[in-house]
Amino acid sequence: MNGASVFLAGALVSAAWLMPAATAQPACVAANASVPPGANTADRSAPFFIDTAGLDFSTAPPTRDPANAGYPRATELPDGTLPPVGAEGNFIIGPNHRPAPETVAQDNVPRGTIHTFTITSGDSVIYNPGIVRDDPPNCRNGSVYTAETAPGDKSNLVFATSHPGTWTRTIDVYVPAGYVPGSEAPFIVFGDGGATGAYPGRDLFTILDNLIQQRRVPPMIAIGIGAGGQDAQGSERGREYDAVSGAYAQWVEREVLPLVEQNVGAKLTRNPDGRATMGISSSGAAAFTMAWSHPELYQRVLAYSPTMVNQQWPHDTALRGGAWEYHANWPGPTGPNLNVAVNVVTPSEAPAGTPLIPNSPPKPIRFWFEVGDQDLFYPNPVMADGMHDWALADEGMAKVLAAKGYRYQFVFARNAKHVDRPTVAQTLPSALEWLWKGCSIQ
Protein backbone atom coordinates (compact mmCIF):
# COMPACT_ATOMS: atom_id res chain seq x y z
CA MET A 1 0.00 0.00 0.00
CA ASN A 2 1.21 3.50 -0.71
CA GLY A 3 1.45 6.35 1.76
CA ALA A 4 -2.03 7.57 0.96
CA SER A 5 -3.50 4.46 2.52
CA VAL A 6 -2.05 5.53 5.87
CA PHE A 7 -4.37 8.52 5.89
CA LEU A 8 -7.35 6.36 4.92
CA ALA A 9 -6.61 4.02 7.81
CA GLY A 10 -6.41 7.04 10.10
CA ALA A 11 -9.81 8.19 8.91
CA LEU A 12 -11.23 4.76 9.63
CA VAL A 13 -9.80 4.87 13.14
CA SER A 14 -11.42 8.26 13.68
CA ALA A 15 -14.72 6.91 12.44
CA ALA A 16 -14.48 3.96 14.81
CA TRP A 17 -14.03 6.32 17.75
CA LEU A 18 -17.37 7.94 16.94
CA MET A 19 -19.18 4.69 17.69
CA PRO A 20 -20.97 4.64 21.06
CA ALA A 21 -19.11 3.02 23.94
CA ALA A 22 -20.27 -0.37 25.13
CA THR A 23 -22.68 -0.14 28.02
CA ALA A 24 -21.55 -3.34 29.70
CA GLN A 25 -18.29 -5.25 29.57
CA PRO A 26 -18.50 -8.87 28.38
CA ALA A 27 -17.35 -11.79 30.48
CA CYS A 28 -13.73 -12.84 30.13
CA VAL A 29 -13.09 -15.25 27.27
CA ALA A 30 -9.74 -17.01 26.93
CA ALA A 31 -7.76 -17.24 23.72
CA ASN A 32 -8.79 -19.99 21.34
CA ALA A 33 -6.41 -22.69 20.04
CA SER A 34 -8.61 -24.89 17.86
CA VAL A 35 -11.03 -24.59 14.95
CA PRO A 36 -13.33 -21.66 15.80
CA PRO A 37 -17.11 -22.10 15.88
CA GLY A 38 -18.85 -21.74 12.54
CA ALA A 39 -15.70 -22.35 10.52
CA ASN A 40 -15.77 -23.63 6.95
CA THR A 41 -13.48 -26.67 7.00
CA ALA A 42 -15.30 -28.70 4.34
CA ASP A 43 -15.57 -26.68 1.12
CA ARG A 44 -12.32 -25.30 -0.24
CA SER A 45 -14.19 -23.38 -2.94
CA ALA A 46 -16.44 -21.56 -0.46
CA PRO A 47 -15.44 -18.33 1.33
CA PHE A 48 -13.20 -18.33 4.39
CA PHE A 49 -12.05 -21.95 4.11
CA ILE A 50 -9.84 -23.21 6.97
CA ASP A 51 -7.52 -26.04 5.95
CA THR A 52 -7.04 -28.57 8.76
CA ALA A 53 -5.20 -31.20 6.71
CA GLY A 54 -2.10 -32.54 8.44
CA LEU A 55 -2.85 -30.84 11.76
CA ASP A 56 -2.65 -32.82 15.01
CA PHE A 57 -5.35 -31.49 17.32
CA SER A 58 -4.22 -33.60 20.28
CA THR A 59 -2.25 -30.50 21.25
CA ALA A 60 -3.48 -26.94 21.62
CA PRO A 61 -2.57 -25.16 19.42
CA PRO A 62 -2.45 -28.04 16.94
CA THR A 63 0.92 -29.45 15.93
CA ARG A 64 1.81 -28.97 12.29
CA ASP A 65 3.70 -31.50 10.22
CA PRO A 66 6.48 -29.81 8.21
CA ALA A 67 5.93 -32.44 5.51
CA ASN A 68 2.43 -31.05 4.92
CA ALA A 69 1.73 -31.10 1.19
CA GLY A 70 0.65 -27.46 1.39
CA TYR A 71 4.04 -26.33 2.70
CA PRO A 72 7.12 -25.71 0.54
CA ARG A 73 9.82 -28.37 0.69
CA ALA A 74 12.40 -27.94 3.42
CA THR A 75 15.69 -29.48 4.52
CA GLU A 76 15.38 -31.34 7.82
CA LEU A 77 18.49 -30.90 9.95
CA PRO A 78 19.81 -33.25 12.66
CA ASP A 79 18.46 -32.39 16.09
CA GLY A 80 20.51 -29.66 17.73
CA THR A 81 21.97 -28.26 14.51
CA LEU A 82 21.17 -25.06 12.66
CA PRO A 83 21.28 -24.04 9.00
CA PRO A 84 24.69 -22.91 7.73
CA VAL A 85 25.12 -19.16 8.01
CA GLY A 86 25.50 -18.85 4.25
CA ALA A 87 22.48 -21.01 3.40
CA GLU A 88 19.19 -19.78 1.99
CA GLY A 89 15.81 -21.48 1.75
CA ASN A 90 13.68 -23.57 4.11
CA PHE A 91 14.93 -25.62 7.06
CA ILE A 92 13.47 -27.77 9.86
CA ILE A 93 15.11 -27.83 13.30
CA GLY A 94 14.39 -29.43 16.67
CA PRO A 95 12.83 -30.94 18.63
CA ASN A 96 15.44 -29.93 21.22
CA HIS A 97 16.54 -26.32 21.57
CA ARG A 98 19.61 -25.66 23.68
CA PRO A 99 20.67 -22.04 24.17
CA ALA A 100 23.57 -20.87 22.05
CA PRO A 101 26.77 -20.07 23.97
CA GLU A 102 26.61 -16.49 22.68
CA THR A 103 23.60 -15.86 24.95
CA VAL A 104 25.88 -15.95 28.01
CA ALA A 105 27.90 -12.89 29.03
CA GLN A 106 31.66 -13.50 29.00
CA ASP A 107 34.06 -11.78 31.41
CA ASN A 108 36.67 -11.25 28.68
CA VAL A 109 34.25 -9.65 26.20
CA PRO A 110 33.83 -5.85 26.25
CA ARG A 111 30.26 -4.86 26.99
CA GLY A 112 28.30 -2.17 25.27
CA THR A 113 26.44 0.52 27.16
CA ILE A 114 22.66 0.80 27.42
CA HIS A 115 20.90 4.15 27.40
CA THR A 116 17.20 4.42 28.19
CA PHE A 117 14.74 7.25 27.68
CA THR A 118 10.97 7.62 27.68
CA ILE A 119 8.58 9.08 25.13
CA THR A 120 4.83 9.73 25.32
CA SER A 121 1.97 10.22 22.90
CA GLY A 122 2.14 13.93 23.68
CA ASP A 123 5.56 13.98 22.01
CA SER A 124 4.23 12.37 18.82
CA VAL A 125 2.69 13.69 15.64
CA ILE A 126 1.93 10.43 13.82
CA TYR A 127 0.54 8.52 16.82
CA ASN A 128 -1.14 11.29 18.80
CA PRO A 129 -3.62 10.56 20.24
CA GLY A 130 -3.05 6.91 20.93
CA ILE A 131 -5.65 4.16 21.14
CA VAL A 132 -6.85 2.52 24.35
CA ARG A 133 -9.26 -0.42 24.39
CA ASP A 134 -11.58 -1.08 27.31
CA ASP A 135 -11.29 -4.74 28.28
CA PRO A 136 -12.91 -6.40 31.29
CA PRO A 137 -10.70 -6.18 34.40
CA ASN A 138 -7.86 -8.71 34.40
CA CYS A 139 -9.02 -10.06 31.04
CA ARG A 140 -6.40 -9.70 28.32
CA ASN A 141 -7.99 -9.06 24.92
CA GLY A 142 -11.39 -9.71 26.49
CA SER A 143 -13.40 -7.31 24.35
CA VAL A 144 -11.66 -8.59 21.21
CA TYR A 145 -12.57 -12.22 21.86
CA THR A 146 -16.24 -11.36 22.40
CA ALA A 147 -16.65 -8.95 19.49
CA GLU A 148 -18.61 -9.67 16.33
CA THR A 149 -17.70 -9.74 12.67
CA ALA A 150 -19.50 -7.74 10.01
CA PRO A 151 -22.47 -9.49 8.35
CA GLY A 152 -21.19 -11.77 5.59
CA ASP A 153 -17.54 -10.94 6.27
CA LYS A 154 -15.75 -13.07 8.87
CA SER A 155 -12.55 -11.10 8.27
CA ASN A 156 -13.95 -7.77 9.50
CA LEU A 157 -13.95 -7.49 13.30
CA VAL A 158 -16.36 -4.88 14.62
CA PHE A 159 -16.40 -3.60 18.19
CA ALA A 160 -16.74 -0.27 19.96
CA THR A 161 -14.53 -0.47 23.03
CA SER A 162 -11.56 1.49 21.64
CA HIS A 163 -11.17 5.22 22.10
CA PRO A 164 -8.49 7.93 22.05
CA GLY A 165 -5.97 7.68 24.84
CA THR A 166 -2.35 8.19 25.80
CA TRP A 167 0.71 5.98 25.74
CA THR A 168 4.13 6.01 27.36
CA ARG A 169 7.00 3.76 26.32
CA THR A 170 10.71 3.31 26.91
CA ILE A 171 13.43 3.20 24.30
CA ASP A 172 16.58 1.18 25.00
CA VAL A 173 19.68 2.04 22.98
CA TYR A 174 22.64 -0.35 22.99
CA VAL A 175 25.93 1.26 21.97
CA PRO A 176 28.75 -1.22 21.28
CA ALA A 177 32.01 -1.06 23.18
CA GLY A 178 34.55 1.12 21.42
CA TYR A 179 32.03 3.19 19.50
CA VAL A 180 33.40 6.63 18.64
CA PRO A 181 30.67 9.23 19.23
CA GLY A 182 29.57 10.90 16.03
CA SER A 183 30.89 8.18 13.74
CA GLU A 184 28.47 6.57 11.28
CA ALA A 185 27.13 3.27 12.59
CA PRO A 186 24.88 0.51 11.26
CA PHE A 187 21.92 -0.28 13.48
CA ILE A 188 19.08 -2.67 14.16
CA VAL A 189 15.72 -1.42 15.42
CA PHE A 190 13.33 -3.85 17.07
CA GLY A 191 9.76 -3.68 18.33
CA ASP A 192 8.40 -5.03 21.60
CA GLY A 193 11.54 -3.69 23.22
CA GLY A 194 12.05 -1.72 26.39
CA ALA A 195 12.41 -2.94 29.95
CA THR A 196 9.06 -4.78 29.91
CA GLY A 197 9.30 -5.99 26.34
CA ALA A 198 10.00 -9.32 24.72
CA TYR A 199 13.72 -9.40 25.57
CA PRO A 200 13.91 -9.63 29.38
CA GLY A 201 17.37 -8.96 30.69
CA ARG A 202 18.12 -7.42 27.33
CA ASP A 203 19.51 -10.73 26.10
CA LEU A 204 19.96 -9.34 22.61
CA PHE A 205 22.60 -6.94 23.86
CA THR A 206 24.67 -9.74 25.40
CA ILE A 207 24.49 -11.63 22.11
CA LEU A 208 25.67 -8.55 20.24
CA ASP A 209 28.60 -8.12 22.65
CA ASN A 210 29.76 -11.64 21.82
CA LEU A 211 29.10 -11.55 18.07
CA ILE A 212 30.83 -8.19 17.66
CA GLN A 213 33.85 -9.43 19.63
CA GLN A 214 34.00 -12.49 17.34
CA ARG A 215 33.66 -10.26 14.24
CA ARG A 216 30.60 -12.17 13.09
CA VAL A 217 28.51 -9.01 12.79
CA PRO A 218 29.56 -5.39 12.33
CA PRO A 219 29.68 -3.20 15.44
CA MET A 220 26.15 -1.82 15.52
CA ILE A 221 23.76 0.20 17.58
CA ALA A 222 20.59 -1.62 18.69
CA ILE A 223 17.39 0.29 19.38
CA GLY A 224 14.62 -1.43 21.34
CA ILE A 225 11.31 0.41 21.06
CA GLY A 226 8.60 -0.38 23.58
CA ALA A 227 5.17 -1.28 22.25
CA GLY A 228 2.33 1.23 22.46
CA GLY A 229 0.19 -0.80 24.84
CA GLN A 230 -2.21 -3.76 24.96
CA ASP A 231 -2.48 -6.22 22.05
CA ALA A 232 -4.47 -7.14 18.95
CA GLN A 233 -7.24 -5.21 17.24
CA GLY A 234 -8.25 -1.92 18.79
CA SER A 235 -4.98 -1.45 20.70
CA GLU A 236 -2.09 0.93 20.11
CA ARG A 237 0.26 -2.03 19.65
CA GLY A 238 -2.02 -3.54 17.03
CA ARG A 239 -2.56 -0.20 15.33
CA GLU A 240 1.18 0.26 14.86
CA TYR A 241 2.40 -3.26 14.18
CA ASP A 242 -0.40 -4.90 12.20
CA ALA A 243 -1.10 -2.13 9.71
CA VAL A 244 0.22 -2.88 6.23
CA SER A 245 1.40 0.66 5.62
CA GLY A 246 4.48 2.82 5.96
CA ALA A 247 3.21 4.67 9.04
CA TYR A 248 5.30 2.85 11.66
CA ALA A 249 8.50 3.16 9.62
CA GLN A 250 7.79 6.87 9.17
CA TRP A 251 7.23 7.27 12.91
CA VAL A 252 10.52 5.54 13.70
CA GLU A 253 12.37 7.61 11.10
CA ARG A 254 10.92 10.99 12.02
CA GLU A 255 10.25 10.73 15.75
CA VAL A 256 12.47 8.02 17.27
CA LEU A 257 15.80 7.94 15.45
CA PRO A 258 16.48 11.68 15.88
CA LEU A 259 15.98 11.24 19.63
CA VAL A 260 18.37 8.28 19.63
CA GLU A 261 21.08 10.35 17.95
CA GLN A 262 20.43 13.24 20.32
CA ASN A 263 20.43 11.15 23.50
CA VAL A 264 23.50 9.00 22.86
CA GLY A 265 25.59 11.16 20.54
CA ALA A 266 25.37 8.63 17.74
CA LYS A 267 25.26 9.02 13.98
CA LEU A 268 22.99 6.37 12.48
CA THR A 269 23.77 5.37 8.93
CA ARG A 270 21.41 6.48 6.17
CA ASN A 271 22.56 3.59 3.99
CA PRO A 272 19.76 0.96 3.90
CA ASP A 273 22.36 -1.82 3.65
CA GLY A 274 23.38 -0.95 7.20
CA ARG A 275 19.86 -0.75 8.64
CA ALA A 276 17.95 -3.76 9.97
CA THR A 277 14.54 -4.32 11.53
CA MET A 278 13.54 -7.06 13.94
CA GLY A 279 10.50 -8.18 15.87
CA ILE A 280 8.38 -10.95 17.30
CA SER A 281 4.78 -11.82 16.49
CA SER A 282 3.06 -8.59 15.38
CA SER A 283 6.25 -6.56 15.72
CA GLY A 284 7.82 -9.18 13.43
CA ALA A 285 5.19 -8.41 10.82
CA ALA A 286 5.88 -4.72 11.38
CA ALA A 287 9.60 -5.33 10.84
CA PHE A 288 8.84 -6.78 7.41
CA THR A 289 6.35 -4.03 6.59
CA MET A 290 8.96 -1.39 7.43
CA ALA A 291 11.26 -2.80 4.75
CA TRP A 292 8.45 -3.55 2.29
CA SER A 293 7.05 -0.02 2.53
CA HIS A 294 10.43 1.71 2.68
CA PRO A 295 13.20 -0.39 1.10
CA GLU A 296 15.13 2.85 0.71
CA LEU A 297 15.39 2.82 4.52
CA TYR A 298 15.61 -0.88 5.49
CA GLN A 299 16.72 -3.99 3.64
CA ARG A 300 17.44 -6.54 6.40
CA VAL A 301 14.63 -8.12 8.44
CA LEU A 302 14.57 -10.71 11.26
CA ALA A 303 11.34 -12.04 12.78
CA TYR A 304 10.10 -14.77 15.12
CA SER A 305 6.55 -16.05 14.56
CA PRO A 306 5.72 -13.01 12.42
CA THR A 307 2.01 -12.24 12.32
CA MET A 308 1.51 -12.47 8.56
CA VAL A 309 -2.21 -12.95 9.16
CA ASN A 310 -5.34 -10.80 9.15
CA GLN A 311 -4.78 -8.62 12.21
CA GLN A 312 -4.96 -5.17 10.61
CA TRP A 313 -7.66 -3.02 12.22
CA PRO A 314 -9.80 -1.10 11.35
CA HIS A 315 -10.77 -3.18 8.33
CA ASP A 316 -9.21 -1.65 5.23
CA THR A 317 -11.23 -2.10 2.05
CA ALA A 318 -8.03 -1.64 0.06
CA LEU A 319 -6.42 -4.69 1.71
CA ARG A 320 -9.12 -6.72 3.42
CA GLY A 321 -6.81 -9.51 4.57
CA GLY A 322 -4.13 -7.29 6.11
CA ALA A 323 -0.71 -8.96 6.24
CA TRP A 324 -2.22 -12.26 5.03
CA GLU A 325 -2.32 -10.65 1.60
CA TYR A 326 1.45 -10.42 1.45
CA HIS A 327 1.45 -14.07 0.43
CA ALA A 328 -2.09 -15.28 -0.30
CA ASN A 329 -5.44 -14.29 -1.73
CA TRP A 330 -8.14 -12.83 0.44
CA PRO A 331 -10.44 -15.86 0.91
CA GLY A 332 -13.70 -13.97 1.24
CA PRO A 333 -16.58 -13.81 -1.24
CA THR A 334 -15.87 -12.48 -4.71
CA GLY A 335 -16.25 -8.73 -4.94
CA PRO A 336 -14.57 -5.61 -6.25
CA ASN A 337 -10.89 -5.23 -5.42
CA LEU A 338 -10.00 -1.71 -4.39
CA ASN A 339 -6.90 0.40 -4.13
CA VAL A 340 -6.12 3.77 -2.61
CA ALA A 341 -4.77 6.80 -4.45
CA VAL A 342 -4.76 10.37 -3.14
CA ASN A 343 -7.09 9.38 -0.30
CA VAL A 344 -9.71 8.09 -2.76
CA VAL A 345 -10.80 4.46 -2.92
CA THR A 346 -10.99 3.34 -6.56
CA PRO A 347 -11.52 0.01 -8.36
CA SER A 348 -8.37 -1.96 -9.09
CA GLU A 349 -7.56 -3.72 -12.35
CA ALA A 350 -6.04 -6.61 -10.40
CA PRO A 351 -8.17 -9.65 -9.52
CA ALA A 352 -9.92 -9.53 -6.15
CA GLY A 353 -7.67 -10.29 -3.21
CA THR A 354 -4.47 -10.28 -5.27
CA PRO A 355 -1.49 -10.94 -2.92
CA LEU A 356 1.24 -8.32 -2.75
CA ILE A 357 4.56 -10.20 -3.02
CA PRO A 358 3.70 -12.37 -6.06
CA ASN A 359 2.34 -9.34 -7.91
CA SER A 360 5.03 -6.78 -7.13
CA PRO A 361 8.57 -6.41 -8.48
CA PRO A 362 11.12 -7.98 -6.09
CA LYS A 363 12.45 -5.61 -3.45
CA PRO A 364 16.00 -5.63 -2.02
CA ILE A 365 14.98 -7.33 1.23
CA ARG A 366 16.99 -10.01 3.06
CA PHE A 367 14.66 -11.87 5.44
CA TRP A 368 15.30 -14.37 8.25
CA PHE A 369 12.21 -15.73 9.99
CA GLU A 370 11.00 -18.63 12.13
CA VAL A 371 7.73 -20.30 13.07
CA GLY A 372 6.91 -23.05 15.58
CA ASP A 373 5.05 -26.28 14.89
CA GLN A 374 2.64 -25.30 17.70
CA ASP A 375 2.38 -21.66 16.75
CA LEU A 376 -0.86 -19.71 17.08
CA PHE A 377 -4.02 -21.04 15.46
CA TYR A 378 -7.16 -18.88 15.40
CA PRO A 379 -6.66 -17.33 18.86
CA ASN A 380 -9.76 -15.18 18.38
CA PRO A 381 -12.77 -17.53 18.53
CA VAL A 382 -15.00 -15.12 16.58
CA MET A 383 -12.74 -14.80 13.50
CA ALA A 384 -13.22 -17.98 11.44
CA ASP A 385 -11.84 -16.13 8.43
CA GLY A 386 -9.32 -18.61 6.99
CA MET A 387 -6.47 -16.18 7.71
CA HIS A 388 -5.31 -16.87 11.28
CA ASP A 389 -3.01 -19.91 11.09
CA TRP A 390 0.45 -18.51 11.88
CA ALA A 391 2.37 -21.55 10.61
CA LEU A 392 0.45 -21.66 7.34
CA ALA A 393 0.98 -17.93 6.91
CA ASP A 394 4.73 -18.11 7.41
CA GLU A 395 5.02 -21.17 5.19
CA GLY A 396 3.11 -19.13 2.61
CA MET A 397 5.66 -16.35 2.96
CA ALA A 398 8.49 -18.81 2.30
CA LYS A 399 6.72 -20.06 -0.82
CA VAL A 400 6.17 -16.64 -2.41
CA LEU A 401 9.60 -15.32 -1.43
CA ALA A 402 11.25 -18.28 -3.14
CA ALA A 403 9.13 -17.82 -6.25
CA LYS A 404 10.21 -14.18 -6.53
CA GLY A 405 13.90 -14.88 -5.93
CA TYR A 406 14.23 -13.22 -2.53
CA ARG A 407 17.21 -13.94 -0.28
CA TYR A 408 15.74 -15.53 2.82
CA GLN A 409 16.26 -18.21 5.43
CA PHE A 410 13.12 -19.73 6.95
CA VAL A 411 13.26 -22.00 10.00
CA PHE A 412 10.39 -24.31 10.99
CA ALA A 413 10.99 -25.35 14.60
CA ARG A 414 9.67 -28.62 15.98
CA ASN A 415 8.48 -28.65 19.60
CA ALA A 416 8.09 -24.87 19.54
CA LYS A 417 5.25 -22.53 20.39
CA HIS A 418 4.60 -18.91 19.48
CA VAL A 419 7.81 -16.87 19.84
CA ASP A 420 9.29 -19.89 21.57
CA ARG A 421 11.94 -18.73 24.02
CA PRO A 422 14.17 -21.84 23.84
CA THR A 423 14.12 -21.58 20.05
CA VAL A 424 15.01 -17.89 20.20
CA ALA A 425 17.92 -18.63 22.53
CA GLN A 426 19.12 -21.39 20.22
CA THR A 427 18.87 -19.50 16.93
CA LEU A 428 19.19 -15.75 17.49
CA PRO A 429 23.01 -15.54 17.32
CA SER A 430 23.18 -17.43 14.02
CA ALA A 431 20.13 -15.56 12.72
CA LEU A 432 21.84 -12.23 13.37
CA GLU A 433 25.00 -13.45 11.67
CA TRP A 434 22.98 -14.55 8.62
CA LEU A 435 21.07 -11.27 8.60
CA TRP A 436 24.19 -9.11 8.45
CA LYS A 437 26.11 -11.23 5.98
CA GLY A 438 27.53 -9.10 3.18
CA CYS A 439 26.95 -5.77 4.91
CA SER A 440 29.01 -3.07 3.23
CA ILE A 441 29.26 -0.95 6.39
CA GLN A 442 31.66 -2.12 9.08
Which residue stretches match the model-derived regions?
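Positively charged n-region of N-terminal signal peptides that target proteins for export
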Residues: 1-5
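Boundary at the C-terminal end of the N-terminal hydrophobic targeting segment
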Residues: 21-26
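Bacterial N-terminal signal peptides
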Residues: 7-17
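Non-catalytic cap/lid and distal C-terminal segments of serine-dependent acyl enzymes
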Residues: 29-35, 40-56, 61-63, 71, ...
